[in-house]
Design a protein with these regions (language model features):
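Gly/Pro-rich hinge or "lid" segments in bacterial periplasmic/extracellular proteins
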Residues: 100-116, 208-277, 284-288, 295, ...
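Surface-exposed binding/hinge segments that line
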Residues: 140, 175-222, 241-248, 392-405
């Protein structure tokens, strides 16, 4: 019930978050060399959005890997999300359920390091050149780069991949994410240039994160092509370190390390991908998954529910030391996990109503009774980072906010929103009294046994969740408080596939969604909060936000030339979003809870910005003799 909670998987439904992150988006991307128009661009092994990359030319490996890690063994994992089956290998289309681990087959021009926020190092590219005017970036491809079929990776493949991802055959999030990249231009067979619609310091990194696949993927023997959005179980042709060895009934899949993998000796790959095989077994629900782990059926359990960590992740194998439990600090930033309100529904359009719903949520009781004190309340869209707004707006924020004053709640110019608290001297009763006053001011009063508007219509809505969720006790507690206000909140569950479809169609009133944290906000913020995405089916603008003021702050964020300007824009955005009460913020943890077999080992130096599953797959290894 933390950051990786149920809806984290749902928001990755189209493959956008998973695929772009797999392509190097987390640390973002990198770029190549080549001459531009007037002045020659400077070629480099890596780039950073601000300042210089941490690792210099000629570096041997990242600090958080073990360059001497032994190779071999099999890593067995369970469902990394709520999906209990898969029906495709293509992670770049909207429909269907993606096979877990499929990102192991693909690479991008560049990849980020996990111990710095916004840099990118050559992967498929061996150098990168950003134009002096910042309006393009050129990548030169490593001549050794090969796809799994043995073909060299060419500029034509890069352009084909980019053009496909921006087309209607790919999930719409890609077109949104790459919107400011106007085109990919083939300079020569080994060189590709990306041209931008405007200057933005992150765009070279974003271009470097474009996933690359072969033009032959989906090509039939007779030369005709299977439409990209119809590719399902056709073997992907990527350049990544693993191949699909076998799969069964959409429930199990085994990856084998490619013995001819071209990039094993690259500095960005040394000490990584140490397992000979990686197996995913998909279980029907969380109970079956946990019991299978305790029975020794798979090797690593990443626990997202604090109560389970204390009460259920126990037993004789833990007592004997065969299974080990550890918490690992991470600095990813909490992002926003909360009960998201769908502004497309009329009952949620008044900010006073939304604030009242926030006042009815008793986090402190939940943390004591259900979570064993394992969480911290979210109070920002950028919590646990320097991107979070605090106090009153500073001079840089005011410079952005003042021109928007007429469009904003005056409260935005005062102290930052403080989440309601029920610890003494606060109380749930006091919060509900405030909520009742806000609802009355918005035209909702209690009569005839329910909260009603001027037309006599009762205040009702549905809280949507997936059938395998552990959120029911949380929802029941929230329902109880809402009922005291006269609000009828119904709890509805759906299987994961149906849930995905409903989210894509914005067919929900309220649902728990997690928007992952970032260290350097970029296009994902436009996709989440930009007005033009509010009506685009399958977009990440889950709340349906249409705000010219927010659009203006997003534009300022995109135009930031320095880290200071980025902070001012993000603080202002955070302040406006929080004062809008578009979500009832839930909670976060600053650690990854990981239980694992003692036959596994990991580097002693931890990365800073990482997912637990990705870290295990990419840098752990099997102890020799096991």
């Amino acid at each position: 019930m933390t950051q990786g909670s149920p809806r984290a998987a749902a928001r990755a439904r189209s493959g956008f978050a998973r695929a772009v992150r797999a392509a190097g988006r987390t640390a973002t991307a990198l770029l190549v060399q080549a001459a531009l128009a007037a002045t020659a661009a400077h070629a480099a092994h890596a780039i950073a959005q601000y300042g210089e990359p941490k690792y210099p030319p000629g570096f041997k490996h990242f600090d958080y890997v073990n360059p001497d890690a032994p190779k071999g063994g099999t890593l067995v994992l369970a469902n990394p999300n709520r999906l209990t089956s898969f029906d495709k290998f293509n992670p770049y289309t909207m429909r269907g359920n993606i096979a877990p681990g499929i990102d192991l087959l693909f690479e991008s021009l560049a990849t980020g390091s996990s111990d710095e926020p916004a840099s990118a190092y050559g992967l498929l590219a061996d150098d990168i050149a950003v134009a002096p005017d910042g309006l393009s970036v050129t990548f030169h491809l490593n001549p050794r780069a090969r796809f799994s079929n043995g073909d060299p990776v060419t500029a034509a493949d890069v352009k084909f991949s980019f053009d496909t991802l921006k087309s209607r055959q790919a999930a719409p999030q890609f077109a949104a994410y790459f919107a400011d990249i106007a085109r990919a231009v083939i300079v020569d067979p080994a060189t590709v240039r990306f041209e931008f619609r405007r200057h933005n310091r992150e765009l070279p990194l974003i271009a470097g994160g474009v996933p690359v696949f072969s033009r032959k993927w989906g090509l039939r023997a007779d030369g005709t092509r299977i439409p990209f959005d119809q590719l399902a179980f056709e073997q992907p042709i990527g350049s990544g370190p693993y191949l699909i060895e076998r799969y069964e009934n959409g429930r199990n899949i085994t990856y084998r390390r490619n013995p001819a993998y071209w990039g094993a000796d690259l500095p960005v790959r040394v000490g990584t991908h140490n397992f000979e095989r990686i197996v995913y077994k998909l279980y029907g629900d969380g109970v079956a998954r946990l019991e299978a782990f305790k029975a020794g059926e798979y090797d690593v359990l990443v626990e997202y529910i604090a109560r389970n960590w204390v009460r259920r992740d126990v037993g004789k194998r833990f007592d004997s030391g065969e299974l080990v439990k550890r918490e690992f600090r991470q600095h990813n930033g909490a992002g926003m996990q909360g009960f998201m309100l769908n502004l497309r529904r009329p009952q949620f359009r008044d900010v006073r109503v939304r604030q009242a719903l926030d006042l009815a949520f008793d986090f402190e009781w939940l943390n004591r009774q259900l979570f064993y004190g394992g969480y911290t309340r979210l109070d920002s869209y950028f919590a646990d980072t320097d991107l979070q707004a605090t106090g009153t707006p500073g001079p840089g924020e005011l410079k952005l906010l003042e021109p928007l004053r007429a469009q904003l709640d005056p409260a935005v110019f005062g102290p930052m929103v403080v989440q309601p608290n029920t610890n003494p001297p606060g109380s749930l009763r006091a919060n509900l009294l405030k909520a009742r006053a806000l609802l009355a001011a918005a035209g909702w009063t209690y009569r005839d046994g329910a909260l009603r508007n001027a037309k006599g219509e009762p205040f009702t809505f549905e809280i949507l969740d997936d059938a395998g969720s552990a959120f029911e006790p949380v929802v029941i507690a929230y329902q109880r408080n809402l009922a005291k206000l006269g609000i009828d909140a119904r709890f509805r569950t759906a299987d994961f596939a149906l849930l995905q479809k409903r989210l894509e169609a914005f067919d929900y009133d309220m649902t728990t969604i997690r928007l992952p944290g970032v260290q350097v906000p970029g296009p994902e913020q436009f996709a989440r909060y930009g007005s033009k995405f509010a009506d685009e089916r399958g977009s990440d603008n889950v709340i349906g936000l249409k705000s010219p003021a927010v659009d203006a702050l997003l534009a300022a964020l995109g135009a930031a030339e320095t880290r200071e300007q980025l902070l001012d824009a993000t603080h202002a955005l955070d302040r406006v979003l929080m004062h809008g009460y578009y979500a009832i913020p839930q909670w976060y943890s600053t650690t990854h809870r990981v239980a694992y077999k003692r036959t596994l080992a990991y580097p002693q130096t931890l990365p800073l910005y990482y997912s637990a599953e990705g870290w295990v797959v990419s840098t752990w290894w099997a102890k020799p003799g096991n």
